[in-house]
Regions:
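Polar/charged low-complexity regulatory segments
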Residues: 1-131, 135-137, 148, 152-187
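Conserved hydrophobic residue
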Residues: 141-142
Length: 187
C-alpha cells in the first residue's frame, strides 16, 4: 500500500519502462554497469522523452544524434576487436570459446528508451569481449601481460564512452521559473 507522499511523487514523475535480463560474467563489466547504467538510463529518459513532452524537439534531436554517434562508434570498435580475437582463434585452428565466470551476475535491467536498450546490448558485447580476451590467455594465444594490457585498454575505452554518454544532457528549460536569470547572476 502506497502512502500519500509516494502517490504524489509517482504521479508527478511517471515513466514507462521495460525489463531486460542482462548477464555479465566479467567483474569490470559488472562494476561499470552498477556505477553508470541507472544514471545514464534516467538521463536518456529526461533528455529525450521529457524534452519532447516539453515541446523541445530540436534539443532532444541534438541529444539523440550525439548519443547515436557515440553508440555507433563503440559498437563498431567492439565488433572489430571481437572479430580480431575470433580470427586469432581461427588462425590457431581453435573455436572461439564461450567463457563463464564464478562471479557471473544476472540483472533485471530496466530501460525506458531505445538508447537504453542499445546500451544494455553494448554492455553485453563489452562483457563478451573481456571474456574473449581472458580466453586468449587461457589458451596460450596471448601472454598474461598482453591480455591484462588489453583488458585495461578496453576498460578505459568503455569507461570514457560511458562518461561521454553521461555528459550528453539537456540544459534546463529556459522557460521554467527555476532557470530564470536573477539580477545577481548578471553581475
Amino acid at each position: 500500500m502506497q502512502t500519500e507522499k509516494n502517490e504524489h511523487k509517482s504521479n508527478r514523475f511517471t515513466r514507462t519502462f521495460f525489463e531486460q535480463d542482462l548477464i555479465l560474467s566479467h567483474r569490470i563489466a559488472q562494476q561499470l554497469h552498477k556505477r553508470f547504467y541507472d544514471r545514464i538510463d534516467h538521463s536518456f529518459f529526461v533528455s529525450m522523452k521529457v524534452l519532447r513532452r516539453q515541446h523541445r524537439d530540436t534539443e532532444a534531436q541534438q541529444i539523440e544524434t550525439a548519443v547515436q554517434g557515440l553508440c555507433d562508434k563503440m559498437e563498431c570498435d567492439l565488433t572489430q576487436a571481437s572479430e580480431r580475437i575470433v580470427a586469432t582463434f581461427a588462425k590457431a585452428q581453435m573455436p572461439s570459446p564461450c567463457g563463464h565466470s564464478d562471479i557471473t551476475a544476472s540483472y533485471k535491467a530496466e530501460y525506458s528508451t531505445g538508447y537504453s536498450f542499445r546500451l544494455l546490448d553494448l554492455f553485453s558485447r563489452f562483457d563478451r569481449l573481456l571474456m574473449q580476451i581472458e580466453a586468449l590467455e587461457l589458451h596460450n594465444l596471448g601472454t598474461a601481460d598482453e591480455c591484462t594490457s588489453l583488458i585495461r585498454f578496453w576498460h578505459g575505452e568503455f569507461h570514457r564512452f560511458l562518461n561521454a554518454l553521461t555528459a550528453v544532457r539537456s540544459r534546463p528549460d529556459p522557460h521554467s521559473s527555476s532557470s530564470k536569470e536573477t539580477p545577481h547572476d548578471k553581475a
